[in-house]
Amino acid sequence: MADLDDIKDGKDFGIGIPQQNPAFTLKGSGSLDWGMQSRLARIFNPKTNRTVMLAFDHGYFQGPTTGLERIDINIAPLFEYADVLMCTRGILRSVVPAAANRPVVLRASGANSILTDLSNEAVAVAMEDAVRLNACAVAAQVYIGTEHEHQSIKNIIQLIDQGMRYGMPTMAVTGVGKDMVRDQRYFSLASRIAAEMGAQVIKTYYVDSGFERIAAGCPVPIVIAGGKKLPERDALEMCYQAIDQGASGVDMGRNIFQSDAPIAMLKAVHAIVHKNENAAAAYQLFLHEQN
């Protein structure tokens, strides 16, 4: 029990000094609740408001694809070099050590794989389970321009509404309709719709022409998908151009774990995202770390 006989009156109240309330400066996030800001601050480094995510959730529709046959062997050694891990709850519980101490963006949608339209997804994780797993955000696809666009929008709305209740951010991942052109106009549309629905983070693709308009027209942070495996120099150039044009980070998978030197690649991407290195300097870092 506290000793009530030794309570001393406080003296240093800083009279005349206004209380300090630093603003939460992540794009579009200043009015969010404390818990949601706290989770976002674990995803996005508060010093740079940027992030390097390692995506290895591909198995939810691709199965044990190249590089993901054994998460414990191929991916676990990369954890310490990423800011954030993006995976499914099955992999998180079975393979990712809690002691890895990395924020997690939890894949929360899934459905078809090889037989029918991939865009026909459903919410695959209850928000209570995401909270139980100490996730920092949940992620679901939104398929603009597909037969199942309406369902995918309902999915993210469900997650957003539940997330607001629990202080859990939602990352909307823009899927591409098979009849849509992968251009600035499409990704601007998809990103803006997801943000208008209330998603706190958008994951979309980099395009060579007009990406700065995609980023500027989206009121919340955008992280780019790595997409298919590219030569390392090209992947780093894509990363640099995206950051230079307004992206708040990257969420790379195949361009990391299918690289011959994945740790070196993560270090090079980190240099671009957090240290503003250009692609040429980052590639030299990759070559140095590779050796």
Swiss-Prot record:
The active site is at K203 (schiff-base intermediate with substrate). GO terms for molecular function: acyltransferase activity, transferring groups other than amino-acyl groups; fructose-bisphosphate aldolase activity. PANTHER family: 3-HYDROXY-5-PHOSPHONOOXYPENTANE-2,4-DIONE THIOLASE (PTHR47916:SF1), FRUCTOSE-BISPHOSPHATE ALDOLASE CLASS 1 (PTHR47916). Homodecamer. InterPro entries: Aldolase_TIM, DeoC/FbaB/LacD_aldolase, DeoC/FbaB_aldolase, FbaB-like, LsrF. NCBIfam families: PRK08227.1 (NF006081). Belongs to the DeoC/FbaB aldolase family. Its main location: cytoplasm. Pfam families: DeoC (PF01791). This is 3-hydroxy-5-phosphonooxypentane-2,4-dione thiolase. It is an enzyme of class 2 (transferase). It catalyses: dihydroxyacetone phosphate + acetyl-CoA = 3-hydroxy-2,4-dioxopentyl phosphate + CoA. Transmembrane segments: none annotated.
